[in-house]
Amino acid sequence: NCHNKINRAQLNAEEIEKEMAAISKTGLQEILILTGESRNKSTVEYIGEACKIARKYFKVIGLEIYPVNSDEYTYLHECGADYVTVFQETYNSDKYETLHLAGHKRIYPYRVNAQERALQGGMRGVGFGALLGLDDFRKDAFATGYHAYLLQRKYPHAEIAFSCPR
């Protein structure tokens, strides 16, 4: 995807406010803010501003963003974010490296440790997901569960969620 030519839209603060207001009128009380993997297109500050706007309308704010450091997760939590989901894709580090040839996403340990940094940054919950099919799905399913289990033991207050691949 690092060479993907698809045009993408990015909302400004006014557009974010308008969308959040419209979505909240449907009765939803939780919102998920998604970005791509580009820090240049969606900076941590931009995501933080979106969280501040969302907090006016929603009780719970989730993020599906690129992995960031603990201080950045703290900032996002202070802006209103409650939980973070990171898709590991596969827990086979050798296979993972063959799938991500360039960019920050290539750094397996940084990505696999994102949920722990989010909890260190004050998030109340984290989500896990493997794509199940890039490697042996049984191994990835087990690794996803074990990853969550280890963090639940270390952070017993944490809310843990699993996302299934589409």
Annotate each PLM feature.
Residues N1-E15:
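Canonical Radical SAM [4Fe-4S] cluster-binding loop centered on the CxxxCxxC motif
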Residues H3-N4, L32-V44:
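Glycine-rich, proline-tolerant flexible connector loops at the mouths of alpha/beta enzymes
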Residues N12, T43, H104-I107, F137-A141:
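Residue-level preference for long, well-ordered alpha-helices that form the structural scaffold
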Residues E17, A21, K25-I31, S42-A130:
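Radical SAM/AdoMet-radical enzyme domain recognition
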Residues T35, Q88-T90, R166:
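Short, small-residue-rich loop/turn micro-motifs
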Residues N40-K41, S70, D135-R138:
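Loop/helix-junction capping segments adjacent to catalytic residues or to phosphate/diphosphate-binding pockets
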Residues P109-R166:
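Conserved C-terminal portion of the radical SAM core fold
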